[in-house]
């Protein structure tokens, strides 16, 4: 990394996304770390380790993909299947606020730790949705497959976008992720992309957890000229509000509300994302 390209990005920072480019090759990349967001979600939802790992992968993947968007919007990643886990969802809004959740098919079902948490979803689909501030949402769907969520995301870009894409997601020590993607219309060539992908595949979970983007990229790609952009802050934030709760209640049938009041004496609504009441 030439000194004039680096800037003041050498300190490890919590909850950031950081873009970089291999300008001579027409390849872009994204780096994310979500330490505080992950800690907040784990405190709110004491998920089994396998479910927590899958949610961490979903959050990292969604944050990485949101950094590649050409236009502003809310990106939602959802993987749903017929397994013990019904679905995992991660959302990144245009304000760079994140939230996510895991849904179980049976709240009491055992969920043993496994090396490939994606397998707890069984057969299913990965859905990527982009909701722009105005206009209709854009949605892409691909079948789940492979051992990791990254496999399904890579397959989506291969089938739907025809863009060579690789992701590395880590939930061993917090949540981090790395993405490489050929630029649309670029002339990187398959050999150039594969060379970088092979080099990036040597990354270790400990390196992702402990190294800032500058140090990590210098270690993985010591001979390449990389332009590293300033970090963008990311944060856990829910969209629930008293106003939205009132709108939900107003949409319910009066008879239903009266029945709840007769049985419980009050109406309690809890946000499934942040547990606010």
Residue spans for each PLM region:
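N-terminal amphipathic/basic-hydrophobic helices that include classical n-h-c signal peptides
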Residues: 1-11
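Cys/His-clustered metal-coordination modules, chiefly Zn-binding fingers
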Residues: 201-277
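Interaction interfaces in information-processing and related assembly proteins
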Residues: 11-230
